[in-house]
Amino acid sequence: MSSTAVPRPKPWETSASLEEPQRNAQSLSAMMTSNQQDSRPTEESNNSNSASESAPEVLPRPAALNSSGTYGESNTIPGIYGNSNYGIPYDNNPYSMNSIYGNSIGRYGYGGSYYGNNYGSFYGGGYGAGAGYGMNNGSGLGESTKATFQLIESLIGAVTGFAQMLESTYMATHNSFFTMISVAEQFGNLKEMLGSFFGIFAIMKFLKKILYRATKGRLGIPPKNFAESEGSKNKLIEDFQKFNDSGTINSNEKATRRKISWKPLLFFLMAVFGFPYLLNKFITKLQTSGTIRASQGNGSEPIDPSKLEFARALYDFVPENPEMEVALKKGDLMAILSKKDPLGRDSDWWKVRTKNGNIGYIPYNYIEIIKRRKKIEHVDDETRTH
């Protein structure tokens, strides 16, 4: 009977022992689902309360403010690897928190901590909205080095301008030198031409002198020595007659002397001192008019302190573009500088200056204008009488 006896079943082969892990897993999943259902109403209530106290919708930004946005503000990578593809789908799948393998793939795999929601906590700073390439860190580096590169560019421009000035001076000197050489050559050619032209008259004069000697003074012209002797005799006779008439030979020369004129000296002084003064005045006037035109072109108007408006922030405002916009806290005071956009057009985004000295644009529905109290001048008179 001992050989035909049925062996006793082992403890792990019983149905109760096999069903026990399944019951534990089902109870664990039921507890987790109940916890999630209990937490959802509280989250919905919190979201409803925060929505009721949230700020109004931000007005659409003008094109002038959106033109300076950077790639750091876009949410392309967080949308792909964050809450859309790898965050929520893998978090709510059968392998998430509600199953036996919930903490392996759902929360720590692709769901919540490591790679989900902008790569989670360990890898979240890489491509999310907080650090790395997010929120203007790349543009901030570019802006910090922008002034240095502008300085280097200005230095290179100055050196290039100086080199161009030297080159233009050299070319002007070169051209003027060869121009003078060409002018000298032209004068030489003119001299040769005049010499050849007047040579004909010299030959004719020589022939007339020969004719004068051949005809014994009847034809032709007398020689030079004979003409000078005849002319000197005539001049002596004329001088003697003048001496008899006026008593002095140089009386006519004294009469013909001119008085010294001061006009050339005055014109010279006016050209030396007056012209630079007038030129300086003209340049100053041009600079003033240019500054006024530039300010009008930029849409900036002169600020009148008596007409300046003040406002108070009603809600917190976080700027998307810190270069053009300014951050606000509820209750902050500010002065409204302009109600126009950078292009000078009327806009819903106003330019303000906070108490901290920050200047930027904000939507007008986030602030409240503080009305000024009218001054009552006759009150002072009444107090004086009492």
From Swiss-Prot:
Residues 281-386 are cytoplasmic. The chain crosses the membrane at residues 264-280. Residues 1-263 are lumenal. Residues 306-372 form the SH3 domain. GO terms for molecular function: protein transmembrane transporter activity; protein-macromolecule adaptor activity. Its main location: membrane. Keywords: Membrane, Peroxisome, Protein transport, SH3 domain, Translocation, Transmembrane, Transmembrane helix, Transport. The keyword Protein transport applies. The keyword Transport applies. Residues 1-76 are annotated as: Disordered. It is found in: Peroxisome membrane. It is a single-pass membrane protein. One of its GO terms (biological process) is protein import into peroxisome matrix, docking. It holds the Pfam family SH3_1. One of its GO terms (cellular component) is peroxisomal importomer complex. Residues 44-55 have a biased composition (Low complexity). SUPFAM superfamilies: SH3-domain. Residues 23-39, 65-76 have a biased composition (Polar residues). Component of the PEX13-PEX14 docking complex, a translocon channel that specifically mediates the import of peroxisomal cargo proteins bound to PEX5 or PEX21 receptors. The PEX13-PEX14 docking complex forms a large import pore which can be opened to a diameter of about 9 nm. Mechanistically, PEX5 (or PEX21) receptor along with cargo proteins associates with the PEX14 subunit of the PEX13-PEX14 docking complex in the cytosol, leading to the insertion of the receptor into the organelle membrane with the concomitant translocation of the cargo into the peroxisome matrix. Present with 7900 molecules/cell in log phase SD medium. Belongs to the peroxin-13 family. Interacts (via SH3 domain) with PEX14 (via SH3-binding motif); forming the PEX13-PEX14 docking complex. This is Peroxisomal membrane protein PEX13.
